[in-house]
Amino acid sequence: TRAFGVRLDLGVAPVFIDTTGDGDLGALAGCSFEYGESDSCPCQPMSLNALLVVKDAAALASVTHASDPSAKDNLAKDAFLAEIKRAGLFPSYSKPTLWQVRDNLMLVMMNHEYGIKPFDAAQVTEATVRARGELNKIVNALRKLGGPWEGVQIAATAEQIGVRDGRRIAGRYTVNKDDLVAGARHDDA
């Protein structure tokens, strides 16, 4: 709806609850909002992950993130980046990560899209298309390396790119750092 200039008719119901995740309803109702950290700091990057099917996940152990907060995980990310570079590419996300989901099904994160307004449908669509293109280009290049990458395929991606940082509707009160430090409680929460 955000792409079509929809206006909100407040007379339809006594209460509206915005569950869009992007603050669309609040924005349509005329509420002010912010996004990013400040005017000079854009939103966090968006990313599109993919599920990959590989021939032998065990053969990719050196590039697979173990979800362990040890230095080994950074080594796996660096090794995965080295493989992408060996294929002649450099991903938009400089810490690409590969996880084993189960058996020969892997999850990959190697794309970031920067400076995209999360409430602009055209920008989100363009970012999604670019991200899919990048994922396919990298996977195709890895496949050409052969070895453990032989036959690697994208099994699935999300419907659209993942948004980390959308609108934050301005409410009656904004929780701040001091509230968090003090463990503040609010009667209406």
What do these predicted regions represent?
Residues 2-15, 19-189:
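Flavin (FAD/FMN)-binding glycine-rich loop and adjacent Rossmann-like elements that form
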